């Protein structure tokens, strides 16, 4: 019984950590894109054209 509960807790913890990491990564990317757009609109356009 305790082993089962422990496995569930471990799985929940891993899921929570993974979700948190993904959430932070998305926020970080959005913030960085927003900063780039505000500061350097011309270079961002050049980068898009080059790609």
From Swiss-Prot:
The chain crosses the membrane at residues 11-28. It comes from the Viruses. GO terms for cellular component: host cell plasma membrane; membrane; virion component. It is found in: Virion; Host cell membrane. Keywords: Host cell membrane, Host membrane, Membrane, Transmembrane, Transmembrane helix, Virion. Signal peptide: none annotated. Belongs to the arteriviridae ORF5a protein family. Minor virion component that plays an essential role in virus infectivity. Interacts with GP2b and GP4. This is Structural protein ORF5a. The lineage of its organism: Viruses, Riboviria, Orthornavirae, Pisuviricota, Pisoniviricetes.
